[in-house]
C-alpha cells in the first residue's frame, strides 16, 4: 500500500495529496471518526466538498466516513446543512455481531466463555478486535477492563462524553439501572436521584443511542410503566462491575476486584445473550 510520504504543513496539503494520488490508481480513503475530525478541524467539510468536486470526473477515490453514533453521522453527512451530501452515494450501519457470528470467528473457547466475551464487548466488532484468542477469557477481561491502561476500561465513558451533553446524569441513570431488575420509569428516576426534566432528557439520549431499551408488558398499563433494560451489554457489564470499583482499579487492584467480586457472580447475566 503506497501512502503519501513527506511532511505536510497543513491538513489541506495532506488531503490534496491523497486525492491527487487517486488520479493514477484506485484508492479507498477512510476517516475513522468523521464527527470528531470535524469538531477538531471545522474546515474539513469545505475541503472535502472542494476536492470531491475537483476530482469527481477523473479521480478514482472511494471515501468512507465512519462514526460511532449513527444519527449524528447522518446529520453531519446527509442532513440539509451538510456540505458533502450531494457526493454521498450510500450509507449503512454496522450492527453488533450475534453470538453465532462470534462463534464463527473460530476461537478455541467454550460456549460459556464465548457468551462472556460477547457480553463484555456488546458484540461490537470494534471491541472484539481487542480480544487476544491466545489468552483465556478471564485474562482478556482483566486486561481490557480492569487495568487503567485497558483498551476498553474507559470506552463507555468516552462514548457518553462524546455524544451526551451531561454525561454525569447518564452515569447516574445507567448505574441505577445496573442495580435494579427491569425497573419502571419512576423507579429508575427515583434511584438515579435526578430531577425529572434532566432524567427525561438523558433517558431519551440513552434510548436513541441504543444503550438502553424499554419493553412494555401487557399488564403494566401506560408507557411509563415499561420495563427498562440494557440493550448494550458492554455498558451493563461496565456499570455493574467496573464503574463502582474504578478507585480500586486505579490503585492496581483490578485483578483482585475481578477474581473476588466479578468472576463469582458474572455468569448470572449470561442468559441475556443466549
What does each model-identified segment do?
Residues 127, 131-133, 137-274:
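Accessory nucleic acid-recognition modules appended to NTPase machines
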Residues 28, 36-81:
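Sensor-1/coupling segment of RecA-like P-loop NTPase cores
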Residues 2-12, 73, 247-258:
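Inter-domain helical "communication" segments and dimerization helices
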Residues 81-87:
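Short, conserved catalytic or adaptor-binding loops enriched in Gly and charged residues
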Residues 36, 68-73, 98-100, 125, ...:
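Conserved nucleotide-binding/hydrolysis micro-motifs of P-loop NTPases
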Amino acid at each position: 500500500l503506497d501512502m503519501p510520504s513527506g511532511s505536510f504543513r497543513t491538513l489541506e496539503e495532506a488531503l490534496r495529496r491523497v486525492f491527487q494520488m487517486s488520479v493514477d490508481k484506485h484508492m479507498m480513503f477512510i476517516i475513522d471518526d468523521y464527527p470528531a475530525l470535524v469538531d477538531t478541524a471545522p474546515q474539513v467539510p469545505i475541503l472535502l466538498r472542494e476536492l470531491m468536486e475537483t476530482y469527481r470526473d477523473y479521480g478514482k477515490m472511494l471515501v468512507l466516513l465512519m462514526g460511532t453514533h449513527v444519527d449524528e453521522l447522518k446529520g453531519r453527512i446527509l442532513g440539509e446543512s451538510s456540505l458533502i451530501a450531494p457526493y454521498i452515494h450510500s450509507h449503512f450501519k454496522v450492527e453488533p455481531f450475534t453470538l453465532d457470528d462470534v462463534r464463527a470467528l473460530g476461537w478455541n473457547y467454550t460456549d460459556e466463555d464465548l457468551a462472556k466475551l460477547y457480553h463484555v464487548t456488546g458484540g461490537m466488532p470494534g471491541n472484539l478486535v481487542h480480544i487476544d484468542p491466545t489468552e483465556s477469557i478471564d485474562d482478556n477481561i482483566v486486561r481490557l477492563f480492569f487495568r487503567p491502561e485497558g483498551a476498553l476500561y474507559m470506552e463507555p465513558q468516552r462514548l457518553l462524553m462524546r455524544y451526551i451533553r451531561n454525561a454525569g446524569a447518564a452515569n447516574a441513570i445507567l448505574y441505577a439501572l445496573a442495580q435494579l431488575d427491569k425497573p419502571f420509569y419512576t423507579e429508575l428516576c427515583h434511584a438515579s436521584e435526578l430531577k425529572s426534566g434532566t432524567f427525561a432528557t438523558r433517558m431519551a439520549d440513552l434510548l436513541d443511542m441504543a444503550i438502553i431499551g424499554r419493553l412494555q408488558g401487557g399488564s403494566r398499563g401506560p408507557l411509563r410503566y415499561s420495563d427498562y433494560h440494557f440493550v448494550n451489554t458492554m455498558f451493563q457489564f461496565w456499570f455493574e462491575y467496573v464503574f463502582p470499583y474504578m478507585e480500586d482499579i486505579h490503585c492496581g487492584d483490578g485483578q483482585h476486584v475481578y477474581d473476588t467480586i466479578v468472576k463469582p457472580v458474572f455468569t448470572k447475566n449470561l442468559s441475556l445473550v443466549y
